[in-house]
Each structure stands twice: as C-alpha cells, then as structure tokens.
Amino acid sequence: MADTWVRMAGFYATGNAGSFFLPEIGDEVVVGFFDNDPRFPVILGSLYNGKNASPYTADAKNSIKAIVTKSLMKLEFNDEKKIITLVTPGNNTIIISDDAKSIEITDQNNNSIKLESGGITMNSPKDINIKATGNINMNATGKINVSATQDLALTGLNVAATAQVGFTGKGNATAEVSASGQTAIKGAMVMIN
C-alpha cells in the first residue's frame, strides 16, 4: 500500500490559531475516513496502550486533568483544589492556587516569588538585582525597613534624606560627615557634644 497523507483532527482549528498536538511516531491512533472513503483518512485521536501508558492513574474523583509532553513538560489542572500547575523537567514551576490563595513561581536554582494574602515574598540563595532604564519608586503606607548583616551602601549623583519630624544618624563605633567642598550644619539650635 502506498503512503498516504493523513489529516489530523484537533479540538480547535482556525486560521493561524488553534491546538497543535501531533501523535509521536509509533503511537496508536484512531483513524476515520471522510465519506467512508479510504483515500481520505483522518486521525481522530490517540490511545494509551500497554506500550504507551498514561502519565496519570484515573481515580473516582476524576479531578486531575493534564497535558504532558514527551519531554515531561506538564500543565496540570486540579479541579478539586482549584490549582493550575505548570512545570518543566528541570523543575521550574508556576503554581496558581485558589486553595492556598496564592501564586508561586520557583526555579531550579531555588529562586522564588510568592504572592499570597500576607503580601509578596521574594527569595534567592544568591543575589536579587532590580534594574530599570527609567526610575525605580518604592512607596508604602506603613514603614519601609532596609537592613543588611554586612555593609549598606547608597550611591547617587545627589543623595537626599528628608524627615517630616525627626532625623537620626548614628554610628555605634564611629561616625563621619565630610565633603571635599563646603560642609554646612544648620538648625534653630545646633548642639555638638
């Protein structure tokens, strides 16, 4: 029998859009024929069998749906807990969970960003770098706390620190205010001890 081109049915197909899932070589497929004519076959779907088993085991709840590629990239839907999970073979993961009321992004290097009711948390075993070609603005209706177990450095063309009520600069060991030009200390009353 001569080779025949076979069309593939998809669950959605339209101009330059739709689903794109082709069976692998050697997969078991279900074939139909347009107008019952064997010259015009169409693949209707794929089947699991003893050689190609399902990546999941069915249960009575039937709450898990998934798309798993041959390289084990996975998109999983959990209808019971309302969770969507996207994961790569290297364990880069996105979890969107109504059950935990959170969104979490984790990579294979243990960097993570978590959005939940208590706020947003970023974690990294190494550095976190934030860059912008424009401005970076941070605003909080409460406090902003910046702390480091080692040095804390602020560098800019000009550095301005303004307090609406009080301003304290303190060094437990030493403190220095210096300039290569003029240095001015002003106040209604200046006390130097």
Regions found by a protein language model. Give the residues of each.
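Right-handed beta-helix
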Residues: 14-193
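Short, structured beta-strand/loop micro-motifs enriched in basic residues and often containing a Trp
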Residues: 4-15
